[in-house]
UniProtKB/Swiss-Prot annotation:
Mg(2+) 2 binds at E273, N275. This is D-alanine--D-alanine ligase. Residues 111-306 form the ATP-grasp domain. Cell wall formation. Mg(2+) 1 binds at D260, E273. Binds 2 magnesium or manganese ions per subunit. One of its GO terms (cellular component) is cytosol. Pfam families: Dala_Dala_lig_C (PF07478), Dala_Dala_lig_N (PF01820). Belongs to the D-alanine--D-alanine ligase family. It comes from Ectopseudomonas mendocina (strain ymp). Its main location: cytoplasm. Gene3D superfamilies: 3.40.50.20, ATP-grasp fold, A domain, ATP-grasp fold, B domain. ATP binds at residues 137-192. Its EC number is 6.3.2.4.
């Protein structure tokens, strides 16, 4: 399948770009959604935006909508609930379906699926109490990374190097999610790899002076480094792309997605997570990877939208 869309922009009909929502990633979604909306309108698509709120069901019933471009990050938009609602309404939409969206949003279940298939992912534990923190420290050792199981954009994440810091980080992460994970820290370079219409795009190497690629490094900092080409040998880059393809296939992603991967000192890659509605801001990674593959931002959003026609009519 070609990365480029050959469809006339008018063939998409009236497109609702869904963004905002109520998740902790609302501000990122607003930026992503407005960027997508502007690009679609500039391309000649009959697109309009909906900031998804309490009146969304009324908007859905009252507006003429031929298809939806989902740019909702986090819970309520990326977790299968919006996908299920649109399925019930008979409205085709971009990206992954209900099951893959729900699975990818749940970091614990995603890791369990990968582990069952023999795909490498860091050792982990679930934290529900101070005793869990102490047991995880004894089993996994330090340093560790703490993360809410159902949040994105590195919200609520922290790197810790003591039991006391682990307990504090667990308590902080629990403000965002009732399920908190702690993972073995993988020391080494981080890569992110996008998949678009079944094709793995050029990997991006990430560098930051922060202790890890956190929210500030992703969206605010000007000192974050992005390497395209990623700096790997041809053989290791091919291995990384193949691992990403297998990881996304295991989850069942569709249309577009992005996987985050670490590499340890021995050269081993470790899967962290998959995002089914990646960011589309001026700092975002999928647009960077698409540019490296020869697609500008407008061509990228048209390709994502075209997949909704080919996959869902």
């Amino acid at each position: 399948m070609s990365l480029h869309s050959s469809l006339d922009p008018k063939a998409f009909g009236r497109v609702a770009v869904l963004f905002g929502g109520k998740s902790a990633e609302r501000e990122v979604s607003l930026k992503s959604g407005n960027a997508v909306l502007s690009a679609l309108q500039a391309a000649g698509v009959d697109a309009f935006g909906i900031d998804v709120g309490d009146d969304f069901l009324q908007r859905l019933a009252s507006e003429k909508i031929d298809r939806a471009f989902i740019v909702l990050h986090g819970r309520g938009g990326e977790d299968g609930s919006m996908q299920g609602l649109l399925e019930c309404a008979g409205i085709p939409y971009t990206g992954s379906g209900i099951l893959a969206s729900a699975l990818a949003m749940d970091k614990l279940r995603t890791k369990q699926v990968w582990h069952s298939l023999g795909l490498p992912t860091p050792r982990h534990a679930v934290l529900t109490s101070q005793a869990d923190c102490e047991a995880a420290a004894a089993e996994l050792g330090f340093p560790l990374i703490v993360k809410p199981a159902h949040e994105g954009s590195s919200i609520g994440m922290a790197k810790v190097e003591s039991v006391e810091a682990l307990i504090a980080a667990w308590q902080d992460a629990a403000r965002y999610d009732s399920q908190v994970l702690v993972e073995q820290w993988i020391a080494g370079p981080e890569y992110t790899v996008a998949v678009l219409r079944g094709e793995v795009l050029p990997p991006i190497g990430l560098g930051t002076p922060h202790s890890f690629y956190d929210y500030d490094a992703k969206y605010l900092a000007d000192d974050t480094q992005y390497r395209i080409p990623c700096g790997l040998s041809a053989e290791k880059e091919a291995e990384l792309k193949e691992l990403t393809a297998r990881a996304c296939e295991a989850v069942g992603t569709q249309g577009w997605a992005r996987a985050d991967v670490m590499q340890d000192a021995s050269g081993q890659f470790w899967l962290l997570e998959v995002n089914t509605v990646p960011g589309m801001t001026d700092h975002s990674l999928v647009p960077m990877a698409a540019r490296a593959a020869g697609l500008d931002f407008q061509q990228l959003v048209l390709a994502i939208l075209a997949d909704s026609v080919e996959a869902r009519g």
